Amino acid sequence: MRIGGVEIAVARNQLKTGAALSYINLIIGNLIPLVYTPIMLRLLGQAEYGLYGIAQSIMGYIGLLNFGIGGTIIRYLSKYRAAGDRGREERVAGLFIKIYSVVCCLILAAGFLFAANLQIYSRSLTADEVATLRVLVILMTVNTAVFLPFSVFSSLVLAHERYVFHKLLGMLSSLAAPLLNLALLFCGFGSVGLVASSTVLNFITYGSYTAYALRKL
């Protein structure tokens, strides 16, 4: 596929601007925790923060079920886009959506299995804390599983070298997350509020990737 001079210039501009936004996002990502974390800990409390940390650790292991497929998706999508083979590009995207749908079921099964067997923490946690931990694990599991297939559209945006949109969306998400988290904590929603915040942001972020990919690519 021959690429015109204008398209090359646009691609270079996307790359340069995307790189600049990456550095800005990196700075934001390092500065925000310095301000956000102490406030969050004070509002959440050590005990509930501990529960949130345990739930995140459990989800870290469950998240390994995605097998690091993201990089593979981008590689194949970029390959067929460079070759100008729109048909294969769409088939690959569809294939990975199906694969992720299967992985989604595995994550749901693993998450609910963990949630049903949290009695192993009964010696170190109270009954109420175990109940809260169970709610957190279930919500995080559903959050991870439901949005996983839609990550294909994020990969599609990157494969088409739309770095500016991708990085801007990531930066806005990085800024919105602590603000929404603190708002929910001030309202007394605790650790469950943090998971709800993550769910809302995932819905907006992946919804934006999906809409952009379907309309612009």
Task: List each language-model region with its residue ranges.
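Membrane-interface junctions at transmembrane-helix termini in multi-pass inner-membrane proteins
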Residues: K16, A145-L172, L182, V192, ...
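N-terminal membrane topogenesis motif
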Residues: M1-I32, G87-G94, A131-L133
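Alpha-helical transmembrane segments of multi-pass membrane proteins
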Residues: L113-A116, T126-F150, K167, M171-L175, ...
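Signature of the first transmembrane helix
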Residues: Q14-S78, I107-F112, N143, S173-P178, ...
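Alpha-helical transmembrane segments of multi-pass membrane transport and lipid-handling proteins
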Residues: L95-S124, L179-A183, C187, S208
